[in-house]
Amino acid sequence: MPVFLGLPVLARFIGWLAGALIAYVAKFFTLGIARIALAISLFLGLIIGLNGLLVSYLSDLTSVLPPEIASAVSYVVPANAAPCLYAIFSLKAAVFIFDVKDRIIGYLDWNKS
């Protein structure tokens, strides 16, 4: 008879243990997914932001010059200077962004947490 009285306590303990285990696994996956989502959103934000910034800088650069200076510069600077500068700046931005991406991936190292 005393064995039957201990069954509810045993069931409660096993339920508590299973609940704690499920909560730990859910917390682990939730934090991992949140960290990955944060890293992806930061990476995409850097790419989109720097790309838009470079395009706006290069388009504003040509519209700021007075007409006399613009015609004088057109004799020296080739017609495809803006795309060339855009390619150079995009490469520098890409190197910076991928460096930041490596740092973010280093932050997301699973062995640290």
From Swiss-Prot:
Top-level taxon of the source organism: Viruses
GO-annotated biological processes: symbiont entry into host cell
InterPro entries: DUF5455
Keyword annotations of the record: Host membrane, Membrane, Transmembrane, Transmembrane helix, Viral penetration into host cytoplasm, Viral penetration into host cytoplasm via pilus retraction, Virion, Virus entry into host cell
Primary localization: virion
Membrane topology: Multi-pass membrane protein
Primary role: Plays essential roles both in the entry of the viral genome into the bacterial host and in budding process. The formation of the G3P-G6P complex termed adsorption complex is essential for correct termination of filamentous phage assembly.
Name listed for the protein in its UniProt record: Head virion protein G6P
